[in-house]
């Protein structure tokens, strides 16, 4: 019996549950999308991805073919036939490309030929509403994975991401400082002076390692795996650490913490009365970012609590 042929289109140019579209590849969004592979473990899966995110998918046992998003791959896929196409990108050109693929079933986003914009296939309209209406998004109260499963007509039961690369490093440090947030959302960063103050408070009680391996995803994964407890902004490292079953302390400000499923972690939010938080935008309108209202002492207390059984 032939396996179901599934094409997943997720280069990472638009975050699935965010209205913003750009050409900065969202590596975290690509990794989080792998939760769908739990539904297609017995299928033949092809994944179209930006080359920057390729290392996140490489070696994944549930992806039979990984293709870089380029003209050659587009022409190849337009000549193939699939049972199911899942388009998780809202880029208009990718939606038009997705519609051109020969397939029996389609999920996610499609192209509106009248207006030249992305629309949703039946069953995904509420996802488009979440993307385009920040107030609706704040009130949704659903985990990102839950919404993704709903897009394909399935029920999420706590499944997590599936990382292809298997780290070889052991645990060498008590605590990892994951301070970088990348270029897309600079205001998600906890102030550097707070990281340094936290290190001072910790002193010699725990061994601390600062973020490394940023230029190579596999090295980055190895570094994360070397940490027992992981302190992080809302970034790629958060999702990798959760996938590796690390004890995570996640610092949230401008983004929605309730979207993030963190079974082995703690979420810390700013102690502030700003009406704008979470603003869900990449630049802050305040004189002082809300991230300044997560105190190093509070993070240290979280370390103590989460470390009682771990260190």
PLM features per residue range, with description:
Residues 1-311:
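Catalytic machinery of carbohydrate-active enzymes
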């Amino acid at each position: 019996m032939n396996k179901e042929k599934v094409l997943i289109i997720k280069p990472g140019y638009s975050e699935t549950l965010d209205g913003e579209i750009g050409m900065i590849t969202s590596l975290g969004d690509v990794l989080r999308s792998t939760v769908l592979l739990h539904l297609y473990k017995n299928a033949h899966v092809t994944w179209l991805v930006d080359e920057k995110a390729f290392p996140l998918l490489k070696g994944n046992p549930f992806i039979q073919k990984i293709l870089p998003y380029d003209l050659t791959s587009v022409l190849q896929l337009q000549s193939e036939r699939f049972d199911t196409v899942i388009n998780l990108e809202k880029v208009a050109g990718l939606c038009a490309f997705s519609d051109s693929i020969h397939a029996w079933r389609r999920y996610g986003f499609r192209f509106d030929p009248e207006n030249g914009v992305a629309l949703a296939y039946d069953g995904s309209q509420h996802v488009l509403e979440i993307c385009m209406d920040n107030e609706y998004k704040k009130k949704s109260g659903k985990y990102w994975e839950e919404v993704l499963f709903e897009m394909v007509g399935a029920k999420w039961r706590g499944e997590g991401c599936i990382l292809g690369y298997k780290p070889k490093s052991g645990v060498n440090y008590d605590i990892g400082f994951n301070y970088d947030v990348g270029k897309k959302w600079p205001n998600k960063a906890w102030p550097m002076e707070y990281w340094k103050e936290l290190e001072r408070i910790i002193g010699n009680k725990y061994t601390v390692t600062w973020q490394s391996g940023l230029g190579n995803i596999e090295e980055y994964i190895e570094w994360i795996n070397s940490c027992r407890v992981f302190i992080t902004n809302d970034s790629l490292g958060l999702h990798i650490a959760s996938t590796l079953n690390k004890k995570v302390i996640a610092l949230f400000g401008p983004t929605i913490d309730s979207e993030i499923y963190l079974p082995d972690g703690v979420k810390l939010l700013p102690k502030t009365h700003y009406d704008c938080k979470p603003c869900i935008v990449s630049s802050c309108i305040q004189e002082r970012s809300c991230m300044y209202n997560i105190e190093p002492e509070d993070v240290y207390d979280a370390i103590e609590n989460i470390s009682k059984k771990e260190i």
